[in-house]
């Protein structure tokens, strides 16, 4: 499995397994099966509400001698309710307990949004709950304060690399001005309908690795019954993507993944079947040509599906 060298000195697998929306009834078995299939990177989050199940799958594979802990690259994300420096370690400790590990390889700030703290014993994960029913409530915590708390946890050995998710360029630049430990990874929504070339160029120019999520565009959000996704043509059925897939004898999904991986961007698709797991893992077995990239570039319409403006008019991407 190819890997990406992070600025922290660690190697991150270039292809991983995304744990968002994995069926809770089969999650542990899916993680275990993915490890047996050769996956080593598992991208999770506190908000996905399945870290105990991910941990169970990991433990089973380790107990059976299929892998050692050091063979795996486990990613989690700090949820919005835990940004205050007093609460960062509380949330991380819950993640470590759920995953049944002593450290995570990568811990990301999930969104540059700070909700009101909700005690873990009150509701975990809290999702959009801020202690007042369905009403949003916020805390005034600068991102750099959260970051400094994460830096302390790196020094304590509980986290190996730290990074951010869903950050625009301006916030990333501001963070770099005050960070002692640079972000190792920027994880963003990235697909042909939302290509963000300048953001990716900026991050990579600063030695920050990029991970793409939602590589298949609207597909993940159709499952959530989201209006924009339901009204958007699936990338799997896009004539440009289909033509490129036919030219290379690959599936549209493989083309979408290779479009990112060939540019040095890590990918984290999920799959429920072994054949698809193998297909996704095999994306580096072919190369797109210059014309393929030029044709895909024309599909960019700056269409974002994961936008906090939809939650409560939170202006991250306005």
From Swiss-Prot:
The species this protein was found in: Scheffersomyces stipitis (strain ATCC 58785 / CBS 6054 / NBRC 10063 / NRRL Y-11545)
Domain of life, per lineage: Eukaryota
Binding annotation for substrate: 110
GO terms, molecular function: D-xylose reductase (NADPH) activity; mRNA binding
Activity regulation (record text): NADP(+) is a potent inhibitor of both the NADPH- and NADH-linked xylose reduction, whereas NAD(+) showS strong inhibition only with the NADH-linked reaction.
Keywords: Carbohydrate metabolism, NAD, NADP, Oxidoreductase, Xylose metabolism
EC number(s) reported in the record: 1.1.1.307
GO biological process: arabinose catabolic process; cellular response to osmotic stress; cellular response to oxidative stress; D-xylose catabolic process; galactose catabolic process
Binding, NAD(+): 165-166, 214-223, 270-280
Active-site residues, as the UniProt record annotates them: 48 (proton donor)
Protein's name according to its UniProt entry: NAD(P)H-dependent D-xylose reductase
Protein family: Belongs to the aldo/keto reductase family.
PROSITE patterns in UniProt: ALDOKETO_REDUCTASE_1, ALDOKETO_REDUCTASE_2, ALDOKETO_REDUCTASE_3
Site, Lowers pKa of active site Tyr: residue positions: 77
Catalytic reaction(s) noted: xylitol + NAD(+) = D-xylose + NADH + H(+); xylitol + NADP(+) = D-xylose + NADPH + H(+)
Function: Reduces D-xylose into xylitol. Has a preference for NADPH, but can also utilize NADH as cosubstrate.
Pathway stated in the Swiss-Prot or TrEMBL entry: Carbohydrate metabolism; D-xylose degradation
pH note: Optimum pH is 6.0.
Pfam families on file: Aldo_ket_red (PF00248)
């Amino acid at each position: 499995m190819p890997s990406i060298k992070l600025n922290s000195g660690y190697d991150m697998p270039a292809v991983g397994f995304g744990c968002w929306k994995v069926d809770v009834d089969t999650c542990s078995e899916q993680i275990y099966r993915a490890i047996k299939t050769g996956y080593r990177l598992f991208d999770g989050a506190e908000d996905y509400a399945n870290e105990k199940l991910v941990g169970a799958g990991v433990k089973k594979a380790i107990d059976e001698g299929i892998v050692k802990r050091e063979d795996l690259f486990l990613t989690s994300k700090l949820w919005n309710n835990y940004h205050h420096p007093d609460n960062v370690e509380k949330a991380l400790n819950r993640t470590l307990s759920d995953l049944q590990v002593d450290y995570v390889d990568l811990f990301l700030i999930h969104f540059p949004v700070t909700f009101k703290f909700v005690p873990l014993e009150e509701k975990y994960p809290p999702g959009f709950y801020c202690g007042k029913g369905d009403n949003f409530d916020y805390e005034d915590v600068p991102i750099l304060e959260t970051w400094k708390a994460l830096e302390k946890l790196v020094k304590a050995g509980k986290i190996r690399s730290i990074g951010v998710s869903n950050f625009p360029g301006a916030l990333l630049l501001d963070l770099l001005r005050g960070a002692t430990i640079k972000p190792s990874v920027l994880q963003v929504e990235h697909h042909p309908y939302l290509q963000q070339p300048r953001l990716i160029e900026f991050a990579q120019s600063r030695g920050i690795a990029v991970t793409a999520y939602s590589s298949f565009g609207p597909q993940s959000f159709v499952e959530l019954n989201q209006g924009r996704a339901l009204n958007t043509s699936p990338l799997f059925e896009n004539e440009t993507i289909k033509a490129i897939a036919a030219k290379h004898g690959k599936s549209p999904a493989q083309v979408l993944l290779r479009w990112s991986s060939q540019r040095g961007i890590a990918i984290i698709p999920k799959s429920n079947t072994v054949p698809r797991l193998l297909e996704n893992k095999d994306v580096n077995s072919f190369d797109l040509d210059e014309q393929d990239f030029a044709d895909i570039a024309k599909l960019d319409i700056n269409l974002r599906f994961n936008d906090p403006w939809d939650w409560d008019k939170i202006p991250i991407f306005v």
